[in-house]
């Protein structure tokens, strides 16, 4: 794949759900790679359009660029793009070859794994960590398979002294999260990822979703510690916790897992006791919550809260999150059980 095509496809696929004009595409490529020229981009886009890989939809005097998923060969082209991205990432990082080789071996025989991607790998590897997201096939043993993958990745983490954070998602959860109006980690991952394993399977999944739904990517990366107080208050109310006498205004919709993580990053004991309430009153995704708590180093606090909640109001999500944190050898920080139970009763969460 030639470099202009790679850069164009990489930029378009990082903005699925947010169609770019040719000017915007040129600017994004320039911001990322240092240079880009409208005339060259336009010429290459026309070539890709003639190959039926892209559609250019005229809107006024500009054209929005979209992937043409009706073309059977597009998936192969996108898989080739992912392989090129992987090659470029690893070219000067030979020390990672043995890690990825062993990771491939550990998942090759796992029929549940559809594809594996790395989130923002260039940034994370500089911090001696890697964030992996696993897309799993539909299975009645989803939680069991998640636990086994966590065990395998923990072994690799210990062997290679490389921090690994796992975001393990079923195909149904993937559908829900990619099309959600809430800000969540999967929508972020789509804009800054390399598919390391099973790129064709990944893009076929995206194709199936995109043909029926609007996929919504997010840029840049969300930092939960910087979620505003007003947005926290608004979202706490959405999930069933409202402080008496406190007014709130419409804010951004964050997923409950991000709201929980943002609160855990604060030192406000009053707000932290809101976490069991919203988790008791609202559904959440155990794998996403475990991933975020590990990524932002708040899993010990979270486990202490979940143990109390599990004692008084056990649910599948709570139990499964505890399972995941325990597999990752998390040591809980105990919370005030009496105070939390009182709050749960006050908010009719029991």
Predicted stretch roles:
Residues 114-118:
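Glycine-rich beta-strand-to-loop/alpha-helix junction loops that act as flexible
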Residues 133-137:
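Short hydrophobic/aromatic beta-strand micro-patches
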Residues 1-111, 121-127, 139-350:
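Catalytic core of pol beta-like nucleotidyltransferases
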């Amino acid at each position: 794949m030639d470099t202009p095509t790679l850069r164009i496809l990489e930029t378009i696929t990082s903005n699925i759900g947010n169609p770019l004009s040719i000017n915007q595409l040129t600017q994004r490529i320039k911001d990322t790679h240092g240079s880009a020229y409208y005339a060259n981009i336009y010429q290459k886009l026309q070539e890709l359009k003639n190959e039926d890989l892209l559609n250019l939809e005229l809107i006024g005097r500009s054209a929005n660029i979209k992937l043409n998923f009706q073309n059977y060969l597009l998936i192969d082209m996108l898989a080739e793009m992912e392989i090129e991205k992987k090659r470029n990432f690893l070219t000067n990082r030979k020390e990672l070859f043995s890690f990825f080789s062993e990771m491939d071996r550990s998942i090759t025989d796992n029929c549940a794994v559809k594809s594996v991607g790395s989130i923002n790998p260039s940034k994370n590897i500089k911090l001696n960590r890697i964030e992996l997201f696993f897309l799993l096939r539909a299975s009645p043993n989803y939680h069991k398979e998640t636990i086994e993958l966590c065990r395998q990745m923990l072994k690799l983490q210990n062997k290679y002294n490389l921090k690994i954070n796992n975001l393990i998602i079923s195909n149904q959860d993937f559908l829900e999260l990619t099309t959600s109006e809430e800000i969540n980690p999967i929508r972020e991952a789509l804009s800054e990822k390399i598919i390391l394993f099973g790129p064709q399977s990944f893009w076929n999944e995206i194709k199936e979703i995109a043909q029926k739904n609007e996929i919504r990517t997010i840029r840049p990366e969300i930092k939960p510690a910087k979620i505003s107080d007003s947005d926290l208050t608004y979202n706490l109310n959405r999930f069933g916790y409202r402080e008496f006498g406190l007014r709130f205004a419409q804010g951004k919709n964050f997923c409950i897992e991000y709201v929980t993580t943002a609160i855990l990053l604060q030192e406000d004991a009053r707000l932290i006791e809101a976490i069991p309430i919203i988790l008791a009153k609202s559904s959440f995704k155990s794998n996403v919550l475990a991933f975020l708590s590990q990524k932002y180093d708040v899993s010990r606090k979270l486990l202490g809260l979940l143990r109390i909640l599990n004692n008084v109001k056990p649910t599948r999500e709570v139990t499964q999150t505890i399972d995941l944190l325990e597999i990752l050898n998390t040591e809980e920080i105990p919370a005030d059980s009496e105070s939390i139970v009182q709050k749960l009763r006050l908010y009719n969460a029991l």
